[in-house]
Regions:
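Short, positively charged
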Residues: 1-62, 66, 70-235
């Protein structure tokens, strides 16, 4: 079930953020309206800084707390959010174990993806149309097993930091960050099914990853000789 949520006031709280319904909220949006008229986006940024609202550390899954509930913020429409950000094969093994159904089914699908890439049947990003056409990342068994991986990275934690001190209880999806009419809340038990048709899988290279032996099975050659071997998931 999707619910619209009401306007409130942003305040920092121990590395996560709280959004209480208070009279100060109109002040925040008054600043935003002024910034739009003047073309001064940094006015909004300065106001947020004064309120103690900053980017959460990477080990924290909840971006904001609203009415004592911790939420993760996800953008819809243009600038869609990343759900799994450049993760290696060994990272999935570390969290889920090499013998788990979740990892083994994911591993098999990534290998199918790599074969399709090498055969030039698909390009880097694989959305629903290509998933269905080439039967990758789409089977019922994969959909069932992948839920635990999805839920971990979206709500619970990361590979590097482990379980988050502030796990997300639900998702606040927004089209325009400062337009509450575009905000919707998804509970944990409904967000995966909501995202399923929109999931885009890709194998990329980001930064200078420290690959391990276990990562080699996912290596996909590139023109510069450096392999692509990190799985990304976005909507």
């Amino acid at each position: 079930m999707i619910r619209q949520i009401e306007l409130g006031d942003l305040k920092g709280l121990n590395g996560a953020y709280r959004y209480d319904q208070k009279d100060a909220a109109p002040d925040f949006f008054e600043v935003h309206e002024h910034a739009v008229k003047m073309g001064l986006d940094d006015v909004v940024i300065r106001r947020l800084q004064k309120l103690g609202v900053t980017k959460s550390p990477s080990g924290i899954k909840a971006d904001v707390g609203i009415n004592k509930a911790y939420l993760s913020l996800k953008m819809s429409g243009v600038g869609k959010s990343s759900l799994i950000n450049h993760q290696t094969r060994s990272g999935f093994i570390k969290i889920f174990g090499s013998n788990s159904d979740a990892f083994q089914l994911l591993d098999a699908e990534v290998l199918k993806y790599i074969k399709c890439r090498r055969d030039r049947l698909i390009t880097e990003d694989v959305g629903l149309d290509k998933r269905e056409e080439f039967n990758i990342f789409i089977s019922d068994s994969f959909r069932h097993a992948f839920r635990s991986i999805f839920d971990y990275f979206v709500f619970e934690g990361t590979v590097g930091w482990g379980a988050s001190k502030f796990p997300a209880e639900c998702i606040l999806s927004f089209g325009k960050a400062l337009d509450p009419s575009t905000w919707s809340v998804y509970q944990r038990n409904e967000y995966y099914d909501h995202c399923w048709p929109s999931l885009v899988f890709s194998l990329r290279r980001h930064g200078r990853p420290k690959f391990r032996v276990a990562d080699r099975a996912w290596f996909l050659g590139a023109d510069d000789g450096a392999p692509k071997g990190q799985l990304s998931l976005r909507i």
